[in-house]
Swiss-Prot record:
Region (Disordered): 231-265
Subcellular location: Secreted, Cell wall
Pfam family, one: Kre9_KNH
Family: Belongs to the KRE9/KNH1 family.
Entry PTM: O-glycosylated.
GO BP term, pick one: fungal-type cell wall organization
Any one annotated GO CC term: extracellular region
Signal sequence segment: 1-14
Superkingdom assignment: Eukaryota
UniProtKB keywords: Cell wall, Cell wall biogenesis/degradation, Glycoprotein, Secreted, Signal
Protein's UniProt name: Cell wall synthesis protein KNH1
UniProt function note: Involved in cell wall beta(1->6) glucan synthesis.
């Protein structure tokens, strides 16, 4: 039992942070293929960069609770790099929203991370992706095995107050699910204020590269408004002649006579 506790205390998640492509970015495959630049960075947590042996990139779609892999689009054995340009054939699937799964293999296990959702257009495949833009990517997964003992790692980094964190990647708490009714009559501050300091000159390298948030424990989706735009009133029968709404007839005024009448009165 003690060995299990010590193992879990030594393991921390957030080994890789995916920073590109960005949310709702669009790529066109009408020329036959779409080139997708994938970017990530290594954080100073376990597993470290030296522990990884390969990275496998898969094109996925679907909601966070039902991930569907469409095709493996690349593999890297050179872990020294932090970017990769994947080519996606237009026949892989239809137009819609996709995301990239990065499977990072280590000597003792693996980690799985996901990019934000992006849009692919010009696709000709019959396999249908998700047409909904879900802002949060699927929850990362980390599994490391030591000897005969395996453990699924659940990071506690999200519980540390944001202002007290440092390092290349920071962790924000999960957004809470909005309620269905508004009951508050006054507002109150949810989190205490924190101090802020500013750089007095340009820095050579970024201090912080990205902010990570855990996957939602609930499902919120959005979609396009597929209703056709309403036609102009003159096109849909709603137009009318203003004269039909007049209760009195219009009259022309002789301004010269009216002016003379005012002068003599």
């Amino acid at each position: 039992m003690l060995s299990i506790i010590l193992l879990l205390m030594q393991l921390v998640a957030a080994d890789i942070a995916v920073v590109g492509p960005s949310l709702d970015q669009s790529f066109d495959a009408s020329g036959g293929t779409a080139k997708i630049p994938i970017q990530w960075l290594f954080t100073p947590n376990t597993p470290s960069q030296d522990d990884f042996t390969s990275l496998t990139f898969s094109l996925c779609s679907g909601p966070n609770y039902k991930i569907e892999a469409f095709k493996v689009i690349g593999k890297l054995s050179d872990i020294g790099t932090t970017d990769f340009e994947a080519e996606v054939s237009q026949s892989v699937g239809a137009n819609g929203y996709y995301y990239v799964q990065i499977y990072a293999a280590t000597t003792d296990g693996y980690t799985i991370h996901y990019s934000p959702r992006f849009k692919l257009t010009g696709m000709t495949g019959s396999k249908l992706p998700d047409t909904l833009l879900i802002t949060a990517p699927p929850t990362p997964e980390t599994r490391v095995t030591t000897g005969d003992l395996g453990a699924t790692i659940d990071s506690k980094s999200f519980d540390i107050p944001y202002g007290e964190q440092n390092g290349k990647a920071k962790f924000a708490p999960m957004q809470t699910q909005p309620g269905t009714k508004i009951t508050a009559t006054t507002w109150s501050r949810r989190y205490a204020t924190s101090a802020v300091s500013f750089f007095t000159s340009l820095t050579a390298t970024p201090v912080q590269h990205t902010t990570l948030t855990p996957g939602w424990s609930y499902y919120i989706s959005s979609d396009y408004n597929y209703a056709p735009p309403a036609p102009f009133p003159s096109d849909n029968g709603g137009w009318y002649d203003p004269k039909k709404r007049q209760s009195f007839t219009t009259r022309k005024l002789n301004m010269d006579k009216l002016r003379k009448r005012r002068q003599t009165s």
